[in-house]
Amino acid sequence: MEPLPLENEDNQLNSNKSTTVSSKNFSNIFHNNIHNKDVVGLTDMCFLENVEENELMNNLQNRFNKDHIYTYIGEQVISVNPFSNKANIYTEQVLKSYQNMYMYEVSPHIYALAQDTYKKLLLSKESQCVIITGESGSGKTEASKIFLNYISKVCSGNLENIQGIMRLIIESNIVLESFGNAKTLRNDNSSRFGKFIEIEFDGKGSPISGKISQFLLEKSRVHSRAIGERSFHVFYQFLTDKRITSKLGLSNDPTQYKYLKDSMCFSISSINDSKDFQKVLESLKQLAWTEQEMESIWRVLGAILLIGNIEFSNDVEKSNVDAVYISTPETLKKVSQLLQCSEDSLEKSLISRSLTLGAGKRQSSIKVLLNQTQAKETRDAFSKVLYDRLFTSIIDKINSTISSKSNNGSNYIIESTIGILDIYGFEIFENNSFEQFIINYSNEKLQQLFINLVLRQEQEEYLKEGIEWKTIDNYFDNTPIIDLIEGQPVGLLKLLEEACLIGQSTPELLIQKFNQFFSKNKHFESFETSNNLSIESQSFTLKHYASPVTYNLDSFIYKNKDPLYQDLIFTMESSKDKFILSLFNKDFQKNSLGVKKIPITAATQFKNAINDLIGKLNTCQPHYIRCIKSNEDKRSNHFDYEAVRHQVRYLNMLETIRVRKAGYCHKQHYTRFLGRYKMISKETWPFWNGTPKDGVMAIVRAASAIQNSTSECQFGKKKLFIKSASTLFHFEELRQKILPSIVITIQRVWRGYKVRKWYKQELQRLREEKEEIQKQIKRKNSANLIQTYYLRYKVLTYIKKLKPWSVGPHYNKGHIMPTLWLRRTPIDSLMQSIHIIWWAKVKVTSLSMEARSLVRQKILALDLFGMGYSRKKEWDCRRKFQADYLSDDSNPKKSQFSESVQAMFQKGGDKEILFADNVIKINKRGKSQLRSLIITDQHIYKYDTKKYTQKKVGLKLHSIVALSTSNKKDTFLAIHFKQPIRDLYIDLGCDFVEKVSEVCTNLVQQVYKLTGTTIPLVFRDPLTFNNSRDSRNNGTDFVVSFSQYPKGKEQRQSTFVKGKGNTAIVYYNLD
């Protein structure tokens, strides 16, 4: 268990030497905490021996003097404002010491109530609310901050999200304090509006969003207040920022603004406006305000201050009417610039108003000029509405930022809420107006709620449940005052509403109405109905639960109407600033059809709002912080006995103590109690089949066997009532002792269940998988069988289609083969290639060896010279390669040729003639010579054509390194040899037949056989060859270019013509 902070004589919370408390020794600590009154007073005033006013006051004073500002009345926290900083009781260590503790295990503190609130929210899943009441200056706002701070630190769940939501809610408090709080005569930081903060939680107890509702902003404070008071803090704060004011063209001096200087109070010793404004700026950024939106806010605030500086003077030129004109045009111009609206339109709206006459088709509008008083009232009303709508838009923006949609989308469900109500305290001033009437009315409603929930309803519940009870009815019941104010058909508010509907109603007529209906009401007094001379003729006194208050009716009607002429609304609706335009985008004085309707008065709006709030509070489980002002002078650590006594009386503290002391500290439905504590009794654990009440009785009997609890418990019809907190703690102790063994049992059973469930699921899964695998195998086998037969059918079909390509003599060559059924283009192309190869093999196989050799030569020639678009040189692929052109009958010297060949074979060892024909050889001087060229399997021979005598030695074929020719239609060929052999350049077209392809094919083929090397065939233009060598074997290259015969000089045979130097031209014919 967490350490228990005990109270001692020196410190309210001994956080330095905290004692660890277990459930076993709690009763001793509880007893010491209660009865240690000689040192610090009673922590819980329900334990007063004599419930008398003096005893209660002495206990509060004793604790206050020892720096113990918090005291319990049951589960309520009484907080006495010391007007000093008690930082030592709000440290992080102190806060942690309250976590997971019960209220009476720890010293009185707001932290204890916050922990109790949060714990009940977790256990019951019911919405909770904290109602903070007390006079103005009693510390309500600070109490709400302390409560919020504790909730933000103890919530569980998604830490990042929680810190984000709670941080935003806390940041919003800083903004709302700046815009909604002000200095009054009784309080330096008085809330001038009521707010209800709702923190929304999910099922795990994690805050997921928030919502803020506000009630009755005291907007009249913008333009008027008592001497010594200030307007809202934000006006003084933003004037401290020179960067903003200089940008807006405003003065930093608050005395320059009429709205601020009238009350003659500009600064407060306890508040640093500049430092606080920096916090406001940071909070606005955290709450997703953009720089542009913040700039619009400062412009609206600046405009409001300058509106107060607009002055009016009587317009003497309009002598027949009481009219005015604006005597400060520069100020008006600056206001229009800040609001980004038409200066002319704004001026007309301030000094005149539009009045609608007639209805329907006869409806018309006229301009009515305003007098001095009316113009000032319009000016002030304009400033009030501007600030009111600005404040409302700020709250709307905060709500949109902290809402569940902004932070969590639809992933979370709101299970319950904690509401924190911080509303005006009871106010009594020297001059009490409409605002004080409404504020005190709201406090009456809250006091009535407290009476109903704590005093009346609790006693009524005891009687309803059949619990023996002696009724306590000597508390102050404020129901008659509530009826007086809001009664139907006649009440103060009802008569005020009627007066507002009558155009000529005055305070005198209104007080007459009040006297007429309420002169005999004991809670109402006026000048005419009483002998109290302090009450003026236009005033009345209400005897509130806190104190009698006299109200001045002088401005009741005007403030309740809260008028704003349509002209000003239309002017604002034309603003170019989107933010300002959004403040006036809904004209509240017209219905959806655009027809003017009767505006709802301020009192009616607040009455509806406070009744809605009371209805919402009634649905929550309430918790109370009762704030008491220690003195009226705001003196530090000073206890004003009489001032505190007065507050104790009207807060009904004595009656609350009597009800708590005589009553029961805890009550719970039998079903819920049985569900939480049934493990205490073996009869009810783990199952109970009887009625819930009998089950609870069995639990109480089991607890009484350990500690006498029977006398502490009373059994109602539907609920169990427990007398003291120690008994409730006893039940909780027993539950905590048994829970570990139950947890182990539950874990064991749960784990066994999980394993068995897993085993069954796994077994079922394996069975299903087995069945599925078997099905898949069967399905796959069937599919394979179907595929086999199908493929067999498709193959046979395809083979039948291929039959024309397998039957001679042409085998359908040149036709596209049928495509496969698979539509695979690469396979189709491959089949086409395979067929061509097969066709070639069939054709070649039927040929003789000689024919095969010729075919191979043709194929090689095709590779060397190409065909079609890839043809490299013109050649005749259809011509038969004859090889020996000199042994046929066309050669007259056939016999001489044959004899020379025989001699050559014998001498040189050659075995085969690859090519023999007459050619023209180019000699080393570039001259053409007719020679017989014989290419054998080993050599190249050159013979004289006349006698067939050999010219020089034969050239070995394996010495050839390359062949070159042009890509033209000439018949010349260069055969390149290894050095020092000079190249051979010959013309193979002597008989006008192209034989370059045949010679090249033979040479390439034979050199490959001899050397295993493929000599290159190069197509060049110009072509270079080595034609001669000197004694040092230095070659002389000829460069041959190619050209067509000049026109008119064409010849059938190509001609070699030597040019200058080592150049030459070969002429050829295109045909």
From Swiss-Prot:
In Gene Ontology terms, what is a biological process of this protein? lateral pseudopodium retraction
Q: Which GO terms describe its cellular component?
A: actin cytoskeleton; actin wave; cell leading edge; cell-cell junction; cytoplasm; macropinocytic cup; macropinocytic cup cytoskeleton; myosin complex
Here the disulfide bonds are none
**Which residues does UniProt assign to the signal peptide?**
none
Q: Where is this region: Actin-binding?
A: 610-632
- Which molecular function terms from Gene Ontology are attached? actin filament binding; ATP binding; calmodulin binding; microfilament motor activity; phosphatidylinositol-3,4,5-trisphosphate binding
Instruction: Report domain Myosin motor positions.
Output: 40-736
Show where the TH1 domain sits: 870-1069
Give the binding site residues for ATP: 134-141
> Briefly, what is this protein's role?
Myosin is a protein that binds to actin and has ATPase activity that is activated by actin.
How is this protein organized at the quaternary level? Answer: Myosin I heavy chain is single-headed. Dimer of a heavy and a light chain. Inability to self-assemble into filaments.
Q: List the protein's name.
A: Myosin IF heavy chain
Which organism was this protein described from? Dictyostelium discoideum (Social amoeba)
What's the encoding gene here?
A: myoF
